[in-house]
């Protein structure tokens, strides 16, 4: 079908139903033309407002309103695709048309109302001419329907809403139609004076009223349209949900990513909003609120102070009522004119614009005014009474003075001149009374002081007599004791003389003993001295301590020789071996039995941890190492375990080796350098008596020397593990050329303090530059009871 003739089409001017729109063959109301434009992607032929089917129905209804009939038909018989496209286009244009109609509707309503109130139609004509020439009667009908649907009319006036003010000859309708459409049809020209004019104005001005169509069926139609739109929206939502579910089933990864993307956007917007609110509240609102509170707090305090002063005083500060105008000045001379409020005025409500004033507040003000008026009336009555009393007083004064002066002058003199002489006499008498009263008080005080002095003297005499009586027997007792001391002293003198005689006897005995010793031991040397005798005894005899030391050394030497024999021969020592060990030890001239006894004692000592004393630092006995206060362990570079040439475990010993009994070469604790620390917790609290430091002998060393052995060391006693500097128990030196096990005696202390933590501090070694080795450290002493 060819639609090219649409471009040359001109709308008819006399069609009764023509409203100025080119909808007969345009794409807005022809499905064939719409399909043609959609197929060839052409723009609409006429760029004019497009009316919906609802507007056409409204136009038809408005034209037939004079006959009293409403005709509405829905002629939707197009295909589904054309309906959707046409609905989309008409919806957009209907929105723009409704907006313009809504704005123009307000202008026309204002102009019409002003024209009716003044009784003319000039404003109506101006409003009509202001409307765009593109709009026609359909615009009026659409406007009426829109106003009725959105509630722009006065819905309360239901009767007036259905009325139409039309002149008998229909001039208004014709003129309005001509003014709106720009042309006049044949039907409308019958009611007008001019028939062949395209643009006509009303012949005679007159009051014009708008025509409203309030058909109740339109509400049902609009409700149906709303339900249809809601259904379409629900269908779209369900379709979207179904597509989302289908996407989740078909491509769950994409759906999940989309969901997370939307959630991320929502969460980002939410966090942004919260941060913005936080910044806004803290930086702007908080500061403004603080300023507002700073300004508001003094106002609250002022209002509180005013309210505390009284409700009446508070209302007196309000500028609503001028209380100063209600009061007038009172005169004492005219007490009859006291203020009497007229309650009739207060009880009358305000007229006109003052009806909005709060009447309940005015009632409270009236009550306060009434109470104030009552008080003023009461004060007026009191003033009247005072005035009458003053007049009576003036009359009496006039009678007493005989009329010499006026009443006012006599009263003024009586009030203004005080009786000075009378006051002076009264003051003098009062002064004399006070002086006499003070004299009486002084006399009483004097009497009391004399009585107190007498009592003190009596008490003093009584005290002296009582003390004298008590001291007499005490003095007598002391005299007796003094006599006894004198007698004892005399007896002690005799004892002293006896002691002197005893000393003399002892000296005599010593002299005699010396002489006898000389006679016994130095017969050949009669002239020898006692010192020579002592030197002789010391050369032939030894002391007990030296003997014990020599025996201990002998046992150790024998034990070392026996141990060496056992380690070499791998057999038990025979008698010949024991004798040779004893002879090597330097003990010659002894029998085999004596040698066996010495060996047995040496073996017994060896079985007793080589010392025969309890080791309180032994780990198996309860001792332990405080590793947190020990020096750093020296790590050897020899790997005990490796994988593909990669060392996995290096050999190293912990400080626990020092308090364990196993001693063999290499089984020691080594620390870096020549200075180190070792802290040992003993098994119990003891009084330290001796310390033993053991190292391997040179004969067992692979290098033949023991340069890694400690040299100078000291032992300290600690009260707790957190004490930095303890009490010195002894400072010693280990001899590398001496025995492998060397014992050192602790220093004697006067307080004899007990300790459970001992610190071994090494100051130097015997020359090794890299490390120092400790094999065994023992602590001996007496446990605390």
Swiss-Prot record:
Major subcellular location class: nucleus
Gene Ontology annotations of biological process type: centrosome localization; homologous chromosome pairing at meiosis; meiotic attachment of telomere to nuclear envelope; nuclear matrix anchoring at nuclear membrane; nucleokinesis involved in cell motility in cerebral cortex radial glia guided migration; ossification; response to mechanical stimulus; spermatogenesis
Post-translational modifications reported in the UniProt record: The disulfide bond with KASH domain-containing nesprins is required for stability of the respective LINC complexes under tensile forces.
Taxonomy, superkingdom: Eukaryota
Record field: transmembrane: 289-308
Record cross-link Glycyl lysine isopeptide (Lys-Gly) (interchain with G-Cter in SUMO2), residues: 195
Location within or outside the cell: Nucleus inner membrane
Topological domain spans for side Nuclear: 1-288
Annotated spans, Sufficient for interaction with SYNE1 and SYNE2: 574-785
Keywords for this protein: Coiled coil, Differentiation, Disulfide bond, Isopeptide bond, Meiosis, Membrane, Nucleus, Phosphoprotein, Signal-anchor, Spermatogenesis, Transmembrane, Transmembrane helix, Ubl conjugation
Membrane topology, as annotated: Single-pass type II membrane protein
Coiled coil start-end: 428-495
UniProt domain SUN: residue ranges: 622-784
GO cellular component, as recorded: chromosome, telomeric region; cytoplasm; intracellular membrane-bounded organelle; meiotic nuclear membrane microtubule tethering complex; nuclear envelope; nuclear inner membrane; nuclear membrane
Matches recorded under InterPro entries: SUN1-5, SUN1_N, Sun_CC2, SUN_dom
Region of interest called LMNA-binding, as start-end residue ranges on this chain: 1-138
Record PTM Phosphoserine, positions in chain: 48, 100, 138, 344
Functional note: As a component of the LINC (LInker of Nucleoskeleton and Cytoskeleton) complex involved in the connection between the nuclear lamina and the cytoskeleton. The nucleocytoplasmic interactions established by the LINC complex play an important role in the transmission of mechanical forces across the nuclear envelope and in nuclear movement and positioning. Required for interkinetic nuclear migration (INM) and essential for nucleokinesis and centrosome-nucleus coupling during radial neuronal migration in the cerebral cortex and during glial migration.
Alphabetical list of PANTHER family matching this protein: SAD1/UNC-84-LIKE PROTEIN-RELATED, SUN DOMAIN-CONTAINING PROTEIN 1
Domain notes: The coiled coil domains differentially mediate trimerization required for binding to nesprins and are proposed to dynamically regulate the oligomeric state by locking the SUN domain in an inactive confirmation. The coiled coil domains are proposed to be involved in load-bearing and force transmission from the cytoskeleton. The SUN domain may play a role in nuclear anchoring and/or migration.
Subunit structure, interactors included: Core component of the LINC complex which is composed of inner nuclear membrane SUN domain-containing proteins coupled to outer nuclear membrane KASH domain-containing nesprins. SUN and KASH domain-containing proteins seem to bind each other promiscuously; however, differentially expression of LINC complex constituents is giving rise to specific assemblies. At least SUN1/2-containing core LINC complexes are proposed to be hexameric composed of three protomers of each KASH and SUN domain-containing protein.
Designated name of the protein: SUN domain-containing protein 1
Species assigned in the record: Homo sapiens
Gene behind this protein: SUN1
